[in-house]
Amino acid sequence: MTSPAPDVLLARLRATGRAFSALGDQPGSDEAADPVTHVEHVPACEGRTSPWPSWAPVPVVDAFAGRGVARPWVHQVDAAELAWSGRSVVVATGTASGKSLAYQLPVLSALLADDRATALYLSPTKALAADQLRTLTELALPGVRPSAYDGDTPLDERDWVRAHSRFVLTNPDMVHRGILPNHARWASFLRRLRFVVIDECHTYRGVFGSHVAAVLRRLRRICARYGASPVFVLASATVSSPQTSAERLVGVPVDAVTDDGSPRGSTTFALWEPPLGPPRGENGAPVRRSAIAETADLLTDLVVSGARTLAFVRSRRAAEVVATSVRRSLDEVAPELANRVAAYRAGYLAEERRALERALLDGSLLGVAATNALELGVDVSGLDAVILAGYPGTLASLWQQSGRAGRSARDALAVLVARDDPLDTYLVHHPQAVFGRPVEATVLDPVNPYVLGPHLCCAAAELPLTPADVTLFGGPAAQAVVDGLVEEGLLRKRPAGWYWTSRQRPQADIRGTGGDPVSVVEATTGRLLGTVDAGASHGTVHPGAVYLHQGETYVVEHLDLDSSVALVRAEAPDWSTHARDITDLQVVSVTRTVDAGPVRLSLGTVDVTEQVVSYLRRRQPGGEIMDETPLDLPARELRTTAVFYTVTPEALEAAGIDAADVPGAAHAAEHAAIGLLPLVATCDRWDIGGLSTALHPDTGLPTVFVYDGHAGGAGFAERGFEAAETWLRATRDAISACGCDNGCPSCVQSPKCGNGNNPLDKAKAVRLLDLVLRALGNVEAGMTGGENVTGGENEARPDAGIADKVQPTGGRLPGKQRDAGSRATGVTGGRPPGDRRREIRPTGADVAGNDVAGNDVAGGGPAGVEVAAAGGGPTG
């Protein structure tokens, strides 16, 4: 069956969408509303080739020629030349641009030129590593012996890999847990290590990126111990400042290759907004048809049309739901196609994943609902269409996912289906924010003390730390952490360096937030189903929570926090659960500020107390709220970074916001700001939290806070401070553009609000944000010498606006004294060594609302990244 052209496919989908709206599900509007808000035609481009480098061995060139590569693209040769010359390089080009050849060419050439040389390849997902291993095996170059070393590798094969493989494909987890602690057994491999390849390096962001940066510094240190200094070759999606991001990740100078020479077919890219339904939501809000239900219908229509389609969803559960729904629909309209639809996600057995990948490659499958495990690099050729069930969090991921279709210069269709949240609403009504702005820079902090502490302990257990090592890990920032570890008795100073003091190996969870993971156990059989990160357990495996494991649904009966065990029973409910939290926040210190008259914008350190207090049950499909159940779980403490602004009561009154309206206005503005921060920072709304209050005791004014949901901060709040005008203007526009009357999940309601989304004042939130934006704009327009701003270094950022000239304050809030409290440190998490803080007390303020950051990512990794690895990660 030949698929119709992209424009024809889109016309069919639009007709179906109008028919659905005509059923009357969108009251008070055109009965035949068009769900497509914008169509962008991304043009095709010609490819540009280069001759093979003179140093490339004939067998390597012939092997690539055998796979249809007569001449490489220019960016492939540019990157390969730099790597071959001994310079670390990042190649940041578009999806399907052939980045793999850019590192395969120098690596394989080196392995053939020196029969003792070795290479290490790091992948964020198992699917991508398996795809690369398949390619390397098919090249069949003599003596290379590529091998996988991950959680799927049988124990009896690992010894062979260590002793004989010259090109090991693994992931950061296995380097951290398997290779570095056992470096003596890997000595032969490491002393001959020529190249380290880091594929899809843009996925290493936030706290997870900081962990990977520490693992790579530990790897460099161990390699140096054996006399090796490998060249790093990084492959990245098109991102802003790839050179800077790569250097922060690996800690060495890196050259960037960004001139993409590959051909590209045209893409018809549609922005799709499901219709608003009846007012069945919280507080009588209208409920928009879910992106999952809409995606299932679109995938059904495309499969019936003969279009090979990949639908990207945000969770493992959603992948199963979409695939099941599509098969059920096909049973009615085209039963012969029902078995040509499947789900693909992490958590499947290795054999199941490999079988699905083969079925995708040979065309046996027409439709696949996948998590982002298939986003990264897997060679799925010949696809006609891609559906994105919600904005994936970053433009880099959006272009990665949409680029899965139309590979090899084929024309393709891509459809972004908006979820019921402020960011998606903003994007489908502001297409320039999708198609007219550069891709984000990757945000990570390699000297986050909460990350450095555990890794410095791991490094000291591998080899005693020296002063040179402290410089490697971050200089003065690392030295402060080392001193704290010595004070805690975890490290001991000796003339030769710092030593790990315990006989047991230190632990560091590079994908979690610290603490022991919670084991999920089937109550009737005692079978271990999986684990959940400690930081996510209160929100994901609380009593009554729905837990999904490999397509099977369970309900949590009991959560034992002392034993870190959640007992579950098999059940098939027609509802989902959503935890709700409340927050208390204390300002510890302010590091950067912008004084804008009645408005003051600040960045600082805060202490947050979070508590899961209840959960909602929502009927599926549909999303209607069934009930809310209270929970009795302990509060958790977090020291992190927040961006916040205050507004004087006089300015609020002048803007038409009475004192009684302030809580609802601030609460609504906070919710929307959380939803829109991913527009300027590489984060997910579940990575951040917020609080708004009509009078905060630490500021003495109405205040809106947005904070990083990770100990020590992850760089997201800092990015919000730097791009405050861009961020808050988008927030204001998203609220204003929403078609509801008084607020809904598409604009100001939050799925994790512990105050029941009450009070919320949509109209007054727009007035509040207008006031803040006018004040910040006046500072920018009237700035002469930076007299209005303090904090941060004077570095040029294209969209930082007023934050460009700030200088560090290094101080605390005027008149605020901090009591010294208990000090704690942890090798697996907790506060950084030497961190003294007072006990958190309730503020007693009129808190308008709060939204607690959570870790709702499948696999416990960073937002949007499926766990790749060593095993032992969450499976739900």
Protein language model features and the residues they cover:
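Helicase motor core with emphasis on the C-terminal RecA-like subdomain
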Residues: 2, 17-67, 71-90, 94-100, ...
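Structured, non-catalytic alpha/beta "coupling" segments that mediate domain-domain communication
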Residues: 3-36, 315, 550-559, 565, ...
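Extended Lys/Arg-rich polyanion-binding regions
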Residues: 412-414, 420-434, 445, 450, ...
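Short cysteine clusters
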Residues: 738-747
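Cys/His-rich metal-chelating microdomains
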Residues: 750
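Short Fe-S-cluster ligation motifs
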Residues: 769-782
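Long, intrinsically disordered low-complexity tandem-repeat segments
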Residues: 784, 790, 808-814, 828-833, ...
